Amino acid sequence: MNFTSEILKCCYKREEVLKNGLSMTIYNKYFDKMRKSAHILVSEGRQDELLPYLGSESVSIRRDIAGLLYNSYPELCKSIFREISEMTVETGLQKCYTIVVATAIDILKYGIPKDFP
């Protein structure tokens, strides 16, 4: 199974949920799938396959990938979260992505569990 591909599918599905205002239950379902695939990828030492996606134009995908890679590349991911945390609707952020900003702020404040993903 191509875990990188599975992770990206989940990221795109999560973004779709936000854009279309769908249920957070669906959003969280894809989070669980994404996390499980990332756990396997990281345990195989292949987390670097996700690094290019930290540069995605999608704020949602950058946030998801930074969350998955946080414990492997903490300083890099913190810089992504800092960048996202400063985004506002007034500076061009689409309103549907405000939850992404909120989670970035929370991660900067509280961190991510050491055993994640």
Predicted regions and their residues:
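Conserved interaction-surface patches within small, structured recognition/assembly domains
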Residues: 47-59, 67-68
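Short inter-helical turns and helix N-cap capping residues of alpha-solenoid HEAT/ARM repeat scaffolds
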Residues: 57-59, 88-93, 97
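Structural detector for internal amphipathic alpha-helices that build alpha-solenoid repeat scaffolds
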Residues: 2-12, 21-42, 63-74, 94-114
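Amphipathic alpha-helical scaffolding segments comprising HEAT/armadillo-like alpha-solenoid repeats
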Residues: 2-8, 17, 42-53, 74-86, ...
